[in-house]
Amino acid sequence: MDEEYEVIVLGTGLKECILSGLLSVDGVKVLHMDRNDYYGGESTSLNLNQLWKKFRGEEKAPEHLGASRDYNVDMMPKFMMGNGKLVRTLIHTDVTKYLSFKAVDGSYVFVKGKVQKVPATPMEALKSSLMGIFEKRRAGKFFSFVQEYDEKDPKTHDGMDLTRVTTKELIAKYGLDGNTIDFIGHAVALHTNDQHLDQPAFDTVMRMKLYAESLARFQGTSPYIYPLYGLGELPQAFARLSAVYGGTYMLNKPECKVEFDEGGKVIGVTSEGETAKCKKIVCDPSYLPNKVRKIGRVARAIAIMSHPIPNTNDSHSVQVIIPQKQLARKSDMYVFCCSYSHNVAPKGKFIAFVSTDAETDNPQTELKPGTDLLGPVDEIFFDMYDRYEPVNEPELDNCFISTSYDATTHFETTVADVLNMYTLITGKQLDLSVDLSAASAAEE
């Protein structure tokens, strides 16, 4: 192990694996280590017995739930936007050849006490039961504006500069009501709070366009895709990619201790008495706990069920977003469901997650609005985990630390962190203008 590397990556979570893959493709000499004997870190996938051990402290799950190996339960389940930056990143690295994707059946929102399909096009707005007849017309006009908006063509701007006009001002022009603003902001543009209303509308409009483009791309009923066998496939695919480019992976390396010189700059990592030298470190918060601070907690429920989530048109894979205002909360709640159709559970079984930024110490009570939507469950587990963000200055110590995974059930915030870290590490922007047909496996 006594070798020199440009970058040592610690932890095989999704963010670390994507960065390791991107750097390898750039020709950077990478050593990738993990203290665990499995891939994925906090974002790993568990079989049924592992799930049981983690949440019940028992070695074996009851037999009536089916074979343990037929379960691939992602600890950080997140759907990918079909046209989004993560899919583009996967294509950029050519890691898609190791993965198979399948479209997600449904995209829903909880508004006015009901689970409803998210309309994202003028046609869908007119059919939606979310709105009354006049609101449908107003929303249809707004969606048409968004659909036709082209940054480079002023004729489509309707006399507005969206880098100056706020989202609130743009929406006011179309006279949309509070519930419509809620589902557009949180279930189409995928904002996690309401700050976007006072920010330039350009970002929200581009997010809405991404949703509609992703929806059109797979001619599906949702804009999302998900790998067969779950997200646990991603870290392993990146490990294979890294090996192709000469990167080295080492699992089960205890006490990966980061070493610094007198000036506080990183010089290497020691494990089992051997030190590998490096110029830069990329890691998750658990490897450098004195360079991060706690920023909150996520409450989550994981359920095993024998039916789809009610009121989702029998969707075998689905996301339901509950905007914060609908529950008088400060943060949105997310419901995620996947099943045997994505090979994450045995035939007839569904895995559901409910997650949110914790505002109390009681996940069971706090998550009730989400767990109530699930219908009867075979089993349910509740837990909470802390979230951390880096407080170090990477230009001084050469340590690049990811932020803990948030409560969202889509990848938009995760990939934003990855791309920002990539720019900090390399000093360049990642070019994501790729041929999207390379991920067409999802259309099967």
Swiss-Prot record:
Q: Name one GO molecular function term.
A: GTPase activator activity
Q: Which PANTHER family match?
A: GUANOSINE NUCLEOTIDE DIPHOSPHATE DISSOCIATION INHIBITOR 2, RAB GDP-DISSOCIATION INHIBITOR
Keyword field contains Metal-binding: no
Please list the tissues where expression of this protein has been recorded.
Expressed in roots and floral buds.
Q: So what does this one do?
A: Regulates the GDP/GTP exchange reaction of most RAB proteins by inhibiting the dissociation of GDP from them, and the subsequent binding of GTP.
Q: Supply the name of the protein.
A: Guanosine nucleotide diphosphate dissociation inhibitor 2
Query: Could you say which protein family the record assigns here?
Result: Belongs to the Rab GDI family.
Q: What is the lineage of its organism?
A: Eukaryota, Viridiplantae, Streptophyta, Embryophyta, Tracheophyta
Q: Which Pfam families match?
A: GDI
Disulfide pairs here are none
| Any one GO BP annotation for this protein | small GTPase-mediated signal transduction
